[in-house]
């Protein structure tokens, strides 16, 4: 059943997320992670990881970059790349390498198996 029909009929479960099949999936968590990206070469996408215990590659991670991220780096998204590991992807479009300092990213983790 489409989510719109379920919501319009008032069948929303507080504290849960309605999946594509209409089932309610629980497991929403949020927090911050301080990461220090290694030097990213010119015109290259790099990645940096942090540990998120319990995260699985089938889960959903939403990451928000910090407002003080180096102006020349472009945040390209994030993914649970392995069990307990989140990868944050950054792109350097400039003509020289960028070695940014440690930054604090915020995240929302949706545990699809909880």
Question: What are these model-derived regions, one by one?
Answer:
Residues 2-55, 83-87, 91-114:
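Extracellular receptor-binding modules and their adjoining Ser/Thr/Gly/Asp/Asn-rich linkers
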Residues 69-80:
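Low-complexity "stalk/linker" and mucin-like segments enriched in Ser/Thr/Pro/Ala/Gly
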């Amino acid at each position: 059943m489409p989510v719109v029909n379920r919501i319009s009929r008032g069948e929303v479960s507080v504290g849960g997320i309605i999946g594509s099949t209409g089932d309610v999936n629980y497991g929403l968590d949020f927090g911050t992670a301080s990461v220090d990206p290694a030097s990213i070469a010119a015109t290259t996408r790099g990645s940096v990881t942090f540990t998120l215990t319990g995260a699985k590659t089938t889960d959903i991670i939403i990451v928000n970059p910090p407002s003080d991220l180096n102006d020349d780096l472009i945040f390209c998204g994030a993914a649970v790349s392995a069990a307990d590991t989140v990868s944050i992807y950054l792109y350097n479009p400039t003509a020289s390498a960028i070695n940014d300092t440690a930054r604090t990213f915020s995240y929302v983790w949706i545990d699809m198996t909880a």
